[in-house]
Regions:
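Periplasmic alpha-helical coiled-coil/stalk elements that build and connect Gram-negative outer-membrane
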Residues: 24, 145-259, 370, 374, ...
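Acidic, low-complexity, intrinsically disordered peripheral segments
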Residues: 75, 422-460
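Amphipathic alpha-helical coiled-coil segments
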Residues: 42-57, 144, 148-167, 178, ...
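A glycine-/polar-enriched beta->alpha junction
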Residues: 31-41, 48-63, 99-104, 111-129, ...
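Bacterial Sec-pathway N-terminal export signals of envelope proteins
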Residues: 21-70, 76-77, 116-117, 131, ...
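Bacterial N-terminal signal peptides that target proteins for export
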Residues: 1-9
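N-terminal signal peptide c-region/cleavage motif recognized by signal peptidases
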Residues: 15-18
Length: 460
């Protein structure tokens, strides 16, 4: 039985183990993460403030109606001097003095006030802040959703690569085990030197150690993905891309940078932070110090009881409708200081926006260029893998006829394993870099994940 036969056996064994696990695709992992990831749950809860803030903004310019009412015990004494009195049949009198007295009486009162803002720059700025804050909540939720999507893809392919590494190592292990048995048998027959036996056994011990480490790595990656998706780690099995789509590479790099200007969540959130600071400055500017309201009021105060002159009662009814102007005359420099502080914060936010634009553009360039180079790397590694397999076949045949040593066979087997893993890693990098590119431009959504999910399902 040759090396290639053992390789086929190893592949069948790995396929059996995979069938006992729950093979999930990328979209299934994403759907599980939506309802399970704790960080995303926090962002989704925060997203709930969006509509209430929009309602608050709309309510700021609606009428405000207030009713106050009260009842209790009290006293009411008045003394009037120098009053003028005139009445039918009583003539006219000047310098009249009169008093009223209620020392222990019951009181009740009510007042109804309606106010409609007409001119209030501070209120207008507060309204804009509420609307911007609602937009910011939307962006924070969108950024968290995109971050989770990227994180799921990275953790998913971390597991897929760990499982592939374990598969390749187990394949090598079986091949070297078979070779070690063959070397011992041939040594006992005197057909090979003892060094061939030692070389194969040393290589076997090394691979066994690598397999143990790879098994631990698989369990670790399973646990991480399980924590994100809520699926059982014992049942997880991730798929690898059968082919790699270059659909996102069809868009030129400069177009990606341009789209990031308006789509990047980081840039958009920092832009809103600057606008919020500018609205805060408007609240304390000179033009915002004056406000004009339409106001209507009606009220009644009543008290009745006994006093110095016997039983008595007093009622006062009032009402008015008109305009009310409010102008702060002196605030001790508080308003100007708050305005200056807000403007400095706006300048800081503008600088952060410029920095974010630069960093996003740099990241897009690096990612896009890596993708362009990665396409050629995948092609080169595919050819290298085919060459390594042909070399292994030739080396195995040469070993059987005595032209190649056991060490040559082991090295050829190592080359095939290394080429397989390098190609797999290159394909995964191409997928992840395209997902990262979409995230940088704020374009990462389920449609992007579906592109690469189809590539995985095509070969499974």
């Amino acid at each position: 039985m040759g090396i290639r036969a053992v390789s086929i056996s190893a592949c069948l064994m790995m396929a059996f183990h995979a069938s006992s696990a729950q093979a999930i695709d990328l979209m299934e992992a994403w759907q599980g993460a939506i309802g399970n990831d704790r960080a995303y749950a926090v962002a989704e809860a925060g997203h709930g403030v969006t509509v209430p803030r929009q309602k608050q903004a709309a309510a700021l310019w609606r009428p405000n109606v207030m009713l106050n009412a009260g009842a209790g015990y009290g006293r009411d004494n008045t003394d009037t001097r120098g009053a003028y009195f005139a009445g039918p049949g009583f003539g006219q009198s000047e310098d009249i003095a009169f008093s009223t007295s209620v020392n222990s009486g019951t009181t009740h009162n009510w007042a109804l006030t309606a106010t409609q803002p007409l001119y209030d720059p501070k209120r207008r700025a507060e309204q804009q802040q509420l609307l911007m804050s609602a937009d910011q909540s939307d962006l924070e939720w969108g950024a968290a959703r995109q971050s989770l999507m990227l994180g799921v893809a990275e953790r998913y392919f971390d597991l897929a690569l760990a499982q592939e590494s374990l598969r390749v190592l187990q394949q090598q292990k079986q091949a070297v085990e078979k070779l070690a048995v063959e070397m011992r048998d041939r040594f006992q027959l005197g057909a090979t030197p003892i060094t061939d036996t030692h070389e194969s056994e040393a290589r076997l011990a090394s691979i066994q150690a690598q397999v143990l480490y790879a098994e631990m790595e698989v369990e670790t990656r399973k646990s991480v993905l399980a924590d994100t998706t809520g699926l059982s780690s014992e049942q997880l099995f991730a798929l690898l891309p059968y082919r790699v789509s270059d659909e996102l590479l069809q868009t030129p790099m400069e177009q990606w940078i341009s789209e990031a200007e308006s789509g990047s969540f980081d840039i958009r959130m920092k832009t809103i932070a600057g606008n919020l600071a500018r609205q805060e400055a408007k609240k304390f500017g000179l033009e915002s110090s004056v406000k004009l309201d339409a106001i209507a009021q009606a009220g009644r105060d009543y008290i009745s009881g006994s006093g110095d002159f016997g039983s008595a009662s007093n009622a006062q009814t009032s009402g008015m409708i008109g305009l009310q102007v409010s102008v702060p005359l002196f605030t001790g420099g508080y308003r100007s200081a708050r305005e200056e502080e807000a403007m400095r914060l706006a300048d800081k936010a503008d600088a952060e926006v410029a920095l974010a634009r630069q960093q996003v553009a740099q990241s897009i360039r690096a990612t896009w260029l890596n993708l362009k180079a990665g396409s050629g790397r995948v092609q080169a590694l595919t050819q290298a893998l085919e060459a390594s397999r042909l070399r292994l076949d030739a080396t195995t045949l040469g070993h059987q006829v005595g032209d190649r040593t056991t060490l040559d066979v082991i090295n050829a087997e190592n080359d095939v394993a290394s080429a397989e893993l390098a190609l797999t890693q290159a394909k995964v990098n191409q997928v992840l870099n395209q997902i990262r590119l979409a995230a940088l431009a704020g374009k990462l959504d389920e449609s992007v994940l579906n592109i690469f999910n189809r590539d995985m399902l095509a070969g499974n």
